[in-house]
Amino acid sequence: MLRYLTAGESHGPALVATMEGIPAHVQVGAVEISEELRRRRLGAGRGARMSFEADELELLAGFRHGETLGDPLAIRIGNSEWEKWRTVMAPGPVAPEDLAGHARAAALTRPRPGHADLAGMQKYDFDEARPILERASARETAARVALGAIAKAFLKQSLGIEVLSHVVSLGPVSAPNGPRPDPSDLTRIDADPVRCADSVTSKRMVAEIEACRKEGDTLGGVVEVLAYGLPAGLGSHSQGDRRLDARLAGALMGIQAIKGVEFGDGFDLTRRRGSQAHDWMEPTEGGIHRVSDRAGGTEGGMSTGQILRVRAAMKPIATVPRALPTVDVTTGEAANAHHQRSDVCAVPAAGVVAEAMAALVLAECALEKFGGDSVTETRRNAQAYLDRLAARGLAVAP
């Protein structure tokens, strides 16, 4: 079983992540994980923090000589701004006079609409929002991206599975339905300022971001995650919480600001008749072939062996520079919300986080299906399964 946890606050000393269940001999280390963290900082529309924020990665446990040991893994991502926050975010008691001179120590009593501020204050009995927003911040996703880098390495080395993402819409601007990006396109997508596969649409998206920035507003959008090389049979039909699509949807909805998820043609399927909504099958010399991929690579809660295709919708960032109306919880009076430093648009980065979450779910499902204490064992078990499908005439044909 694959298990992981993250800990840490946005302006605390560090984020920490632990994970248990990754087999031995996955070739992955600081270079590969740091590259994924770099990708998370990509994209037009990011705030000032991205220009100086450094993810100070340290591998604490479970690695040796560039590979995993099969032990629990532990990772630390240091906060390069910690010295500025050492007093305000100190874990131990701080005298009131020591806080008096710090602007950052001002009580945040005007909760921001769209954030966890007010609900968190109500739930955890805080008088201000700082204790809530620090953990609710999307900064936490850096830890999940680091773990996702390990899951990606395991998937590729054991099963040949590759996961990528691209931005398909940003605000009112949508990319046309064109050729689906594959892993060979990832470098080109990452080089694009909004991680859009269509260069013409990308320019329109950048213009929309700049217009939003000038108007003191924010933008949301939709990212698509694609997974290539999946075998049929990951997940299960037997219980709702074991269905692959349910697990992926839950993982993606767990990303800050994600408000919707769809697989394949998703909501468009509701506008078609059944005869035009499903993926017909036909026999070929290579096995059973589906003539379309409307389902997005899952049927009955299991992978079909086709390309997994899932989209996640990100709402506009809730920290709006021109400040939304709220209530000051100290006075009970109407007020404008606090403005914390934020992005205009973080949709390109959300795609990288979504890749990580999808990889973690797929790695867990792969280990449930094939097991293995080492990458070699997982690979051997998976190949035996594929050979058995072929012998029975049930292989998946591209």
UniProtKB/Swiss-Prot annotation:
Keyword Transferase set for record: no
GO process annotations (BP): amino acid biosynthetic process; aromatic amino acid family biosynthetic process; chorismate biosynthetic process
Catalytic reactions on record: 5-O-(1-carboxyvinyl)-3-phosphoshikimate = chorismate + phosphate
Region (Disordered): 279-300
Keywords: Amino-acid biosynthesis, Aromatic amino acid biosynthesis, FAD, Flavoprotein, FMN, Lyase, NADP
Single GO MF descriptor: chorismate synthase activity
Disulphide-bridged cysteine pairs: none
GO CC, alphabetical: cytosol
Residues involved in FMN binding: 135-137, 256-257, 300, 315-319, 341
Metabolic or biological pathway: Metabolic intermediate biosynthesis; chorismate biosynthesis; chorismate from D-erythrose 4-phosphate and phosphoenolpyruvate: step 7/7
Cofactor mode of binding and number, as noted: Reduced FMN (FMNH(2)).
Pfam families: Chorismate_synt
Keyword Cell cycle: no
EC number, UniProt record: 4.2.3.5
Binding annotation for NADP(+): 40, 46
Cofactor: FMNH2
Similarity field: Belongs to the chorismate synthase family.
Subunit structure: Homotetramer.
Function (record text): This reaction introduces a second double bond into the aromatic ring system.
Name of the protein: Chorismate synthase
Organism: Cutibacterium acnes (strain DSM 16379 / KPA171202)
